[in-house]
Amino acid sequence: MNQETFIKYKNIYIVPTFHSRVEFAKLVRTNYFKVFPDLIAVELPSNIREEVKEGVNRLPYLSLIAYADSLSPDLLNFIPIDPSDSIIEAIRTGLEYKVPVEFIDLSLKTYKPPPGKLPDDFSINKIGLPHFYQIIAEQEKYKGYDAQKLQIEQNVSVQEYFEKEILRRQKEEQQEAQEEIQTQEAVNQFQEGAAQENPQIEEEDIRHIEKDILREKYMASNLLRMMPLYNRILLVVGMAHWNSIKYYLDHPGKIENVDVDQVPFKYVKIYNIKSSDARYLLKEIPFHTTQWIKFRRKYSKTALDQIEDPSEFFAILNSYQKITHIRKIFLKAKKEYEKEFKEFIDLHRLKTIFQYSRNLTFTNDMLLPRLYQLLIAAKNIVDDDYAWKVYEIASEYPFNDKSEKYETMDLTTLGGMTPDGHFVRLRPRHAYPYSQKSDLPMKERPDEKYEGEWREEWEKNKWRTVSYPPEDIIEEDYFHFIRKKALKNLKNERIRIEEFKSSLMDGIAIKETIRNWAYEQKIYVKNEQKI
């Protein structure tokens, strides 16, 4: 990676990112050693600072920071502590090297960004971050979005938002003691009223844009306050926000000097996530995230401090490549498949799997395959059993916290189940195009209810099986002899004897050559046709 890895604005070194993508986490770690910042600023609200740091400190175990405005929430906002996320990597690096980390974002109620298809971030390795960002910023979608922001930004005030938020909180606290549980009739009336209002999509868009403007003004205000105090600031922020933040930094008169402590949430909790649920929390294939964790361990602070040559230092930092891990997934699955099913996958089929997954990826306008492309390639070239092995290897996340220090939330694609049996709706967005395990592109395979269930059933019923090993061995040897004899006969029938001209083909036909040598003095060869 010889290209620039950051965007510089005065004394701020910016890494615009896509969240939960390991390529951007790699950029953050590389840029730390290029910049050696006095301060790291991240796009997270300050009123969950301690919980996020606690979650980062317990990595590689996965955590989920859930927070809400009420004490008994039905809908939770959450921040996944994803090891492959660039913001989490920035916080982790700051804690590791004892660099101050500032959370500069504004906390908003029920903030939900609209979904969108993102380009493949693997291209950063070839074109560099500034060029990658420039291409995205020039897209019509982002140009139109920025134009909408400029139209309504004058009517959006961060200070007014804080004042309204404080009043809203006070009003809610006064009503909490008096309000009773809403009846089903009231809920139905509310739903009917909401259905009659039928808000327009444009209004939803404006509300979302207003929230983005509030956040960007608040982040710009914090950066303006910090810039005179530090020589080098490393800023890790979402790709869609930097252009507007830069605009407010260039026009400081358009933002207020906001110096208000954000109101803490009434419900903030750290949940442990089991390794088996990692695929619901991580956007990257869990195997990629696992390899990133192992890479960081191998080249930890102690190991990197021993490297003296700068070129060798950055070559090591950039040596993590997802493309090599895709090969490892297929090869590891091949080994497990051959061990369990006693069927061999030859090099030709393995090469075909690589080519198939590559071509399938290109047809989906991507550079590297996601899990879906890996499964389709494995299924179509080999079979469903091999595809299941690929799924198991790719989805495996080996780090599981069994200390029970934190409550564990069970995750699905629909939401999360707390230990007390309370179902909460979450807003996870991952890269898999299916919603349930049954939607995988393979025949569904039953799972054991508990480890060793099938072995236990076999031990219970093994004496009911009509079989006698000595006789079985004799029968199997006889079947093997018949099979071998049949193949030999078929092979002999497909041998053609030809006169030697330019090629020995499959060897000299000794009998035919000797038989005709006395009067023809010609050599004959065998042409064995495959069965």
Model-derived segments and spans:
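Compositional signal for N-terminal targeting/processing segments
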Residues: 1-531
